[in-house]
């Protein structure tokens, strides 16, 4: 079974299959389009993945600059977002390298991307968190961070001390926090176990199959600075 980071680099179809079952009530779309004015905006999106966040606003934005560190996953995003080819410019960049960009945007958004860098960086985590905050705030009038508040959890909580530190820093730096439900829905528990386990690991797979879950609860945090 591939690990989470291997999935991003080499298994875009598996990742896309996962996110296509996520948020079956469409709560992220409802939130982003009720609270953010996207019309004719220049948007920078970091960690575009297969385009799941982008689909929520791309039809309204004037231009999207899409960044990811994996050409493999960008290729999948290009397929998923082929209706908006003229509106999107793709670039390969690691989130650590945001400071190298000269671009300015009206809105910056990232979804389930910066958190991975925070979790990976054990030596300079505090500095990495502040870099992500400072470099995005200086490049856009509005900044939106979307990160996990727990998958297969009974209530919303940061999954681990590292992400908790990240989320507290966002609030301390002027971001407002919002929590939504982004539950997964599958046709049967075998499918749920296969797909969720392929990304989150055997422990989640076994729990889903043992409890015969077809709907997997998930909470998502949205932090907005403007």
Predicted feature residues:
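Conserved class I S-adenosyl-L-methionine
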Residues: 1-39, 142-169
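Class I SAM-dependent methyltransferase SAM/SAH-binding core
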Residues: 44, 50-97
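Conserved Class I S-adenosyl-L-methionine
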Residues: 50, 178-226
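Short amphipathic alpha-helix with an adjacent loop that forms part of the alpha/beta core around
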Residues: 98-103
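A conserved beta-strand element that flanks and buttresses the S-adenosyl-L-methionine
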Residues: 109
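Short catalytic micro-motifs in class I SAM-dependent methyltransferases
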Residues: 112-116, 147
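A short, conserved alpha-helix within the catalytic core of class I
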Residues: 117-134
């Amino acid at each position: 079974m591939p690990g989470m980071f291997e999935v991003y680099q080499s298994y875009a179809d598996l990742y896309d299959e996962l996110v296509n079952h996520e948020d079956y009530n469409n709560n992220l779309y409802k939130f982003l389009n009720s609270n953010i004015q996207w019309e004719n905006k220049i948007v920078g999106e970091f960690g575009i993945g297969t385009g799941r966040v982008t689909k929520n606003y791309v039809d309204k934005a004037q231009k999207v600059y899409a960044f990811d560190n994996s050409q493999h996953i960008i290729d999948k995003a290009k397929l998923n977002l082929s209706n908006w080819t003229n509106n999107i410019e793709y670039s390969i960049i690691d989130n650590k390298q945001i400071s190298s960009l000269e671009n300015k945007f009206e809105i910056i958004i990232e979804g389930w991307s910066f958190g991975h860098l925070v979790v990976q960086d054990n030596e300079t985590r505090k500095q990495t968190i502040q870099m992500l905050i400072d470099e995005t705030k200086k490049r856009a009038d509005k900044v939106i961070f979307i990160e996990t508040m727990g998958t297969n959890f009974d209530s919303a909580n940061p999954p681990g001390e590292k992400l908790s530190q990240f989320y507290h820093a966002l609030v301390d730096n002027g971001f407002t926090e919002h929590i939504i439900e982004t539950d997964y829905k599958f046709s049967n528990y075998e499918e749920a176990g296969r797909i969720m386990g392929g990304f989150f690991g055997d422990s989640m797979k076994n729990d889903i199959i043992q409890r015969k879950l077809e709907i997997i609860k998930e909470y998502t945090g949205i932090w907005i600075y403007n």
